[in-house]
Amino acid sequence: MSSPNPEDVPRRPEPEPSSSNKKKKKRKWLRQEASIQALTRAGHGALQAGQNHEALNNFQRAFLLASKAPQTRDTPVLQACAFNLGAAYVETGDPARGLELLLRAHPEEKAQGRRHGDQCFNVALAYHALGELPQALAWYHRALGHYQPQGDQGEAWAKMGACYQALGQPELAAHCLQEASQAYAQERQLRAAALALGAAAGCMLKSGRHRVGEVVQVLEKSRRLAERSTERRLLGHLYNDLGLGYSQLQLFPLAVEAFLQALPLCWVPGEQATVLRNLGMAHNALGNYQEAREFHQKAADLHGSVGQRWEQGRSFGSLAFALSQLGDHKAARDNYLHALQAARDSGDMKGQWQACEGLGAAAARLGQYDQALKYYKEALAQCQKEPDSVRERLVAKLADTVRTRLAQVGLVQTHTLTSAPGRLQAPGGASQAEGTPAKAGSSTAGVQHRSSSGWEDEEFEEGHQKKKEERSANVPVRAGPGRPELCFLPGTVNHSHHLASSCPTFTKHTPCRGTVLGKASIYSPGPRAHLPFVGPGPPRAEYPSILVPNGPQANRSSRWPRESLSRSRQRRPMESGICTIV
């Protein structure tokens, strides 16, 4: 007898889930939902506390729970978890993985509202961090459209300005930053508005398309906004930045005024040292060498007290220059030696050849021509990567020192001294009387004596001759004499050009950035994420900032490299000087 076909065997209908089972599943889902909410809140709190990796761990667990629960697959809850996790990845330095998750959250073009603006903004941040700036700009534009009705467009404008800066389009960057400032002012975020406007002025300078009056007008507006803010420490940074802007315009009396306003508002020793150094630079430019000496001495002492060897070395160099202008060439030599040692200790190659050039000039002033030759040769050997004008200046000084040395020992009659094959001669073939030191100035015969450093004297001298012309013409931003290098307080981008010769520097401080998931901005409280379970309104964190840096900042917690400022060795990618504060 054949066995019955299993398909022919009647099956009992599967029992429908009992009401008790439904209740169990519902309770289980409610527990999972509560866990997702708790993990999301914990992740958000960790971000606010700067604990990025703990935040990432919480968002990962929330995303896994949402992925496993059948009720949340392909739902807004899962999308929100993907969004938060993606933003956290961007925040912690993994923009590629973050971008994948952010796109999974489906930031729809047709959707409107702040939440969708946040989605677009974080996608833009990821592209920005990956260096895909055109894509980043497109998503910032999209975020801007979502934010406009909500009044949140300031951050999007600010980040667009950063992109345009990185693309080498300072004019567009200036426009975006001015729009950002206006938006922040409308939102009563006076701190962010003032900083954005200060950054816009820097971009205007860099573009070279604006007259001095236009830039000054923007700087003054930034000052007025800052004065309405109650954040006193911010005011210190901003006044320092204003001083930098005035210095770039060669409006040194206004720069001194701004730096003096910054000084009592900067309480951290490193920040105070930065402002003091800037004050010294501005007074050097004005020819107030006694005041400059006092400020540079205080700056060097303060930088040394907090272990800022790089900055201390530059302060010693500026102090030596002021001393040389006061005629104290022995003290100038001693401080150039301090500057040289500090530059060697901190790996500051530019500072080393600058100090050697100053030592050569000081030795020549003291009649120690063998020492002068030694230091000029050392400076020339160390500046091979500098512009041609630097090497040409050193060659001229070296040639003039050789000629002066020969005249001094009586080997050659000064009036018959001429060039010979393989012999260096000062430009123009000028000569000087035996044993007679050359006068400080611009004559070719006295090149090595123009200043004890070979930088500020000739550069500021030529700069002052051009000042009247520059005030009536567009402001050029290019390498050349007459413009001191700027020093920034950490957190700022130096908008000055690279100088052809070795100028001392004004300085800028750079602020540390905190973190909040979602939108990030240079001037604003920073990024925010749409955290679906954290209650109304995304929290923001307040973090001081100065100018827009090159490149993206993934979220508020990402630390930007400190560029071209008065900083310690590890944070010195750009060669610049007037100093910024962090």
From Swiss-Prot:
UniProt keyword Repeat present: yes
Database matches in InterPro entries: TPR-like_helical_dom_sf, TPR_24, TPR_rpt
Ranges of biased composition (kind: Polar residues): 441-454
UniProt entry tagged with the keyword Repeat: yes
Gene3D superfamilies: Tetratricopeptide repeat domain
UniProt region (Disordered), positions on chain: 1-31, 418-481, 548-582
Ranges of compositional bias, category Basic and acidic residues: 462-472
Keywords: Repeat, TPR repeat
TPR repeats: 36-69, 79-112, 117-150, 154-187, 236-271, 273-306, 313-346, 353-386
PANTHER family: TETRATRICOPEPTIDE REPEAT PROTEIN 24
Protein name: Tetratricopeptide repeat protein 24
Species whose genome carries this gene: Homo sapiens (Human)
